[in-house]
Amino acid sequence: MQTPLESTDVKLDTLNEPSAHLIEKNVALPKDIFRSYLSYWIYEIARYTPVMILSLVIGVLVLLIIFFNDNEACVFNSAYYAYLSLVVLLIILGDGNPKLVSRRNFRTELLVDVITRKPAVEGKEWRIITYNMNQYLFNHGQWHTPYYFYSDEDCYRYFLRLVEGVTPKKQTATSIGNSPVTAKPEDAIESASPSSRLNYRNFLLKAAEIERQAQENYWRRRHPNIDALLKKTE
């Protein structure tokens, strides 16, 4: 489970480098625990009460159809309710119950963890963030197992959807990633304790800044001459 955040380390003007001292080792995610995604999926389904109940109902209705096939009314009613149950079951399986991970407190927890750790693109920081989010959902009763996100890639994709369309704070014109992003003192996150009044929009903007900086650093590492290429296009 995630340790309490150190409020003094969470500042809006610290976007430069990932916080290496916050990266924890030996964190096992579902993709490390299960042999395949199928085995993980079966494990999750077997422990999801609504799915188990619907599966049991469908099984009972199918047995009624088999053993009372000479009773047209029984067969018709059983087939009708089995069909409805199957439709609901497929909706649940396809939906993935996103409402459980759309609550503001969970999104805030994810944003604060990203702000604290400043993960790089494809960085190992995402492993501990994913582990923390899985534990958070389970410990707070928002998911039935501590394995909601199968991998760090899944958690990262969820984060990207969260900050999609969010415009980070405007900066002065510079070449890509040459200078750290600074913010006004009043934007600093004074405290990240559960009792504090969290400014969700502030966290969202800050996390979007960090992701933008991480993307720029990623592409600069892959293409060291990117500044020269950009100057040619000006």
Curated annotation (Swiss-Prot):
Residues spanning the membrane: 48-68, 73-93
Keywords linked to the UniProt accession: Cytoplasmic vesicle, Endoplasmic reticulum, ER-Golgi transport, Golgi apparatus, Membrane, Phosphoprotein, Protein transport, Transmembrane, Transmembrane helix, Transport
UniProt cross-references to InterPro entries, sorted A to Z: DUP/COS (IPR001142)
Keyword 4Fe-4S: no
Record keyword Transferase present: no
GO BP field: endoplasmic reticulum to Golgi vesicle-mediated transport; protein transport; retrograde vesicle-mediated transport, Golgi to endoplasmic reticulum; vesicle organization
A GO cellular-component term linked to this record: ER to Golgi transport vesicle membrane
Bilayer topology term: Multi-pass membrane protein
Sites of Phosphothreonine modification: 3
Extracellular membrane side: 69-72
Protein's cellular compartments: Endoplasmic reticulum; Golgi apparatus; Cytoplasmic vesicle, COPI-coated vesicle membrane; Cytoplasmic vesicle, COPII-coated vesicle membrane
One Pfam family hit: DUP
Subunit text: Interacts with MST28. Binds to coatomer proteins of COPI and SEC23/SEC24 of COPII coated vesicles.
Further facts: Members of the DUP240 multigene family are specific to S.cerevisiae sensu strictu. Cells lacking all 10 DUP240 proteins show no obvious alterations in mating, sporulation and cell growth.
General function of this protein: Involved in protein trafficking vesicle formation, probably by stabilizing of coatomer at the Golgi membrane and thus allowing the efficient formation of COPI coated vesicles.
Record family assignment: Belongs to the DUP/COS family.
Name recorded for this polypeptide: Multicopy suppressor of SEC21 protein 27
Naturally occurring in which organism (per UniProt): Saccharomyces cerevisiae (strain ATCC 204508 / S288c)
Gene that this sequence comes from: MST27
